Amino acid sequence: MKLQKPKGTQDILPGDAAKWQYVESVARDTFSQYNYGEIRTPMFEHYEVISRSVGDTTDIVTKEMYDFYDKGDRHITLRPEGTAPVVRSYVENKLFAPEVQKPVKLYYIGSMFRYERPQAGRLREFHQIGVECFGAANPATDVETIAMAYHLFEKLGIKDVTLHLNSLGSPESRAAYRQALIDYLTPMRDQLSKDSQRRLDENPLRVLDSKEKEDKLAVEKAPSILDYLDEESQAHFEAVKDMLEALDIPYVIDTNMVRGLDYYNHTIFEFITSVEGSDLTICAGGRYDSLVGYFGGPETPGFGFGLGLERLLMVIEKQGITLPIETEMDVYLAVLGDGANSKALELVQAIRRQGFTAERDYLGRKIKAQFKSADTFKAKLVMTLGESEVEAGKAVIKNNRSRQEVEVSFEDMMTNFANISEQLLS
């Protein structure tokens, strides 16, 4: 049997991993500018953590969860999204306590799991960057969080990003709109897809989110949720729009956007970009003011977003964005003969401990093959170490581009490599 990775997963090899690390690093730096701290939650949770918060009728719970019973007969699921686990942690660890500074700002980076049909930018194990902000109902929190995502995309050089915005209002507004949508869709029930016929009974707002052609046609003239917002919800949404304009962040109103998770209220948003003529959602989120209370904590407003790393990296590649990844090596040691083996290890380790990237030959190859490796590694400096150099206690180091070279004692290499490097590279 040929052993291969499971369908819908990937091996991220070193060349690609460098791009991942860069994007993650830019995200961490950006979030720290906004006073966010990292949280790491388990990759698996009790099934109820996800099913009861995300929604029993959502596609995630009914079709996509990787759930199982463990050896203690506990119902467990691999996490399909990041918000519910973070909210569970917020409540379990009492981050709502008075002594904890509010708002509590958290970010996470990690694997999520959904049983979906694998396609470009969508895998069964995928990686998500997300943020959650707890404790502030102020619409400025909505805008700051949206602006943080926008800031991240600017730093990464992503082009043609459009903010799509909607409001789901308060629970009361949503209930009124739900009934209006049922009244509108029921006469055309037979024209809907099978999934949307089920959604009409269980969660009619999800019909608006359907990608099926017949459903899109049916909801074209559906009533707008914005017409059902109560006074408080209208004021919140107007404040969000005003502050986005104050920050020069353009947006479009999309009244058919509802998001695929049941816990949202008030502001919801998506960032969409164009790739090869197709629109792709690269970030999505919104406000969820009842979720902390649902998990047994005090009523606490929340706002957050998630973005898929695979999709983000695909956009970066398709838009021709070159990431400034350092690929050069500082020094390569070519080793000739068994008598130089031990000293080569000693020297390369001393150079690394001074903060330089270094590699040496371990395969006993001919000098030409070793120099070729130095070129492959893009080594700035190359040193050749043989038994005669070991006896003399010194060796020649050369600039691999200019071919300028200098003879240096082992003692200087082991204690003062910065000066040697500066002399050859300046």
From Swiss-Prot:
The keyword Cytoplasm applies. It is found in: Cytoplasm. It catalyses: tRNA(His) + L-histidine + ATP = L-histidyl-tRNA(His) + AMP + diphosphate + H(+). Its EC number is 6.1.1.21. Gene3D superfamilies: Anticodon-binding domain (3.40.50.800), Bira Bifunctional Protein, Domain 2 (3.30.930.10). GO terms for cellular component: cytoplasm. The keyword NADP does not apply. Keywords: Aminoacyl-tRNA synthetase, ATP-binding, Cytoplasm, Ligase, Nucleotide-binding, Protein biosynthesis. CDD domains: HisRS-like_core, HisRS_anticodon. Pfam families: HGTP_anticodon (PF03129), tRNA-synt_His (PF13393). SUPFAM superfamilies: Class II aaRS ABD-related (SSF52954), Class II aaRS and biotin synthetases (SSF55681). One of its GO terms (molecular function) is catalytic activity, acting on a protein. GO terms for biological process: histidyl-tRNA aminoacylation. InterPro entries: aa-tRNA-synth_II, aa-tRNA-synth_II/BPL/LPL, Anticodon-bd, Anticodon-bd_dom_sf, His-tRNA-ligase, HisRS-like_core, HisRS/HisZ, HisRS_anticodon. Its main location: cytoplasm. Belongs to the class-II aminoacyl-tRNA synthetase family. PANTHER family: HISTIDINE--TRNA LIGASE, MITOCHONDRIAL-RELATED, HISTIDYL-TRNA SYNTHETASE. Homodimer. HAMAP family: His_tRNA_synth. This is Histidine--tRNA ligase. The gene is hisS.
